């Protein structure tokens, strides 16, 4: 089964007429984790990313090829504490193939289904990684 991709939308800001020379870009996604080995294993398998261990107790996950807006790198750093409460920010993933088959694969890797008040008509599935960080698998990539 093909790995999932991280969804990101890239817009031509200049075309909006609001170009800002001081605008920033997302460089990477950073996740504070309690169990570094567990989370590196889960996210590298989920995304199909390569692992680079740091000397400081962290790990960098690199996408095949170069990081991009649709495939950013991930930095996992040990926090020593468990996650508390609902995420204020989460990842939306899109499968290269059948989204429900991808959900089953992710659950097999250690993800679990999460109820955040869905109505049942959503076009996504809410999951949590082994430490409880919520993320979604979209039925299809977002369009503008």
Where do the model's predicted regions map?
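N-terminal beta-strand motif that seeds the catalytic metal site of vicinal oxygen chelate
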Residues: 11-40, 89, 141-144
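Core segments of cupin and vicinal oxygen chelate
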Residues: 23, 30-73, 108, 121
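Vicinal oxygen chelate
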Residues: 35-36, 91-131
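Charge-dense, helix-prone N-terminal extensions
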Residues: 45-51, 69, 82-85, 99-119, ...
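Domain-length accessory/inserted modules outside core catalytic folds
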Residues: 61-63, 67-69, 74-86, 93-97, ...
């Amino acid at each position: 089964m093909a790995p999932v991709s991280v969804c990101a939308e890239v817009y031509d800001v200049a075309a909006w007429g609001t170009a800002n020379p001081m605008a920033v870009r997302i460089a990477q996604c950073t996740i504070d984790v309690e169990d570094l080995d567990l989370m590196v294993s889960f996210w590298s398998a989920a995304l199909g990313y390569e692992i680079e261990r740091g000397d400081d107790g962290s790990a960098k996950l690199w996408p095949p090829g170069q990081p991009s807006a649709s495939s950013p790198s991930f930095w996992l750093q040990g926090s020593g504490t468990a996650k508390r409460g609902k995420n204020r920010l989460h990842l939306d993933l899109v499968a290269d193939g059948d989204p429900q088959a991808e959900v089953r694969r992710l659950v097999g890797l250690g993800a679990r289904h999460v109820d955040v008040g869905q109505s049942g008509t959503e076009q996504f599935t809410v999951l949590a990684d082994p430490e409880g960080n919520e993320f979604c698998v979209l039925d299809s990539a977002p369009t503008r």
